[in-house]
Amino acid sequence: MPIRHIIVHQIDKKPDGTPAVLHARDTELGASQAIENMLADLNESYNAKQGKAWGLFHGESGAYPFSRWLKDYLDENQDFTAFSRHAVEHLQKLMEESNLSTGGHVLFAHYQQGMTDYLTVALLHHSEGVAVNDTLDVTPAKHLDLGQLHLAARINISEWQNNKQSKQYISFIKGKNGRKVSDYFRDFIGCQEGVDAPGETRTLLKAFSDFVESEDLPEEQAREKTNTLVGYATSQAKLGEPMTLEELSGLIDEDRPKAFYDHIRNRDYGLSPEIPADKRTLNQFRRFTGRAEGLSISFEAHLLGSKIDYDENAGTLTIRNLPTQLRDQLKRG
């Protein structure tokens, strides 16, 4: 993972309305194994983070200047240090306007993964710990707590520059339960949500369920294809990459690599060619299936306890809210 440029600034700020104090670094960080390890750990923590949103920049304006500064840097109208200085000063201002915000170390990293350029911006905090020194004494020690990552964004620079239609070249961590504490950071980046990752993932899973049902697959085959989908989606989420429908289709049915893709297009589910995987939605998706003596039952695990009740002692399933099509067939029968 070649690191093109990386720098860290510090903002001192308490959540009590006091002014934020900026300690800006004048030069980029030099290349070292420690820097590479830190960025690798940061990426791993970010990829594992649930509840991310995907979107795009707002139009350039005085309220959202970040994209203009980034463009100036990429066009070589200013260097990376100057770009980061403009950005962190803007973040300092937004922090002062948000009483709930706290300071920390602000990291800017421009790096390359494969053929793709990324910019990661993250607000990092320290944790107190202990260490054993050379004289075998136990001493206090601070370390960057990359596991507690609450404010961060990653911009796919290559996607932004080369795909003008994209609405998902930025990912960012959303605040939990609608909290406003992270809004200032989203405004700092100047991004808006362009893709509903949970909704897109649910639609994909619905399309997959319809596909499996239409194929009338044996139970074992249906389970294998489900595991393939969940495995691929989970793998992409760990990499921080979206799912590609054509690639997924080829994995689901190697003999007919276009079958699932054509099913999606023919049914017009409205899915984008690339979908960011939502881990929470994926974790809820697992199918229970069974077939015997002319009876075939298949349903998603998250319906158990809501629309479907299982009585283990009686060996019965109670199903509520039957599909309209099934009810109509039963009436006619």
Swiss-Prot record:
Cytoplasm found in the keyword field: yes
Primary location recorded for the protein, binned into one broad class: cytoplasm
Cellular localization per UniProt: Cytoplasm, Nucleoid
Q: Which keywords describe this protein according to UniProt?
A: Cytoplasm, Plasmid
Q: Which InterPro entries match?
A: Nucleoid_associated_NdpA (IPR007358)
Q: Does the record bear Thylakoid in its keywords?
A: no
Signal peptide location:
none
Q: Name one GO cellular component term.
A: bacterial nucleoid
Q: Which GO terms describe its molecular function?
A: double-stranded DNA binding; single-stranded RNA binding
Specify the domain of life of the species encoding this protein: Bacteria
HAMAP family per record: NdpA
UniProt record similarity statement: Belongs to the YejK family.
Can you name this protein?
Answer: Nucleoid-associated protein
State the taxonomy lineage: Bacteria, Pseudomonadati, Pseudomonadota, Gammaproteobacteria, Pseudomonadales
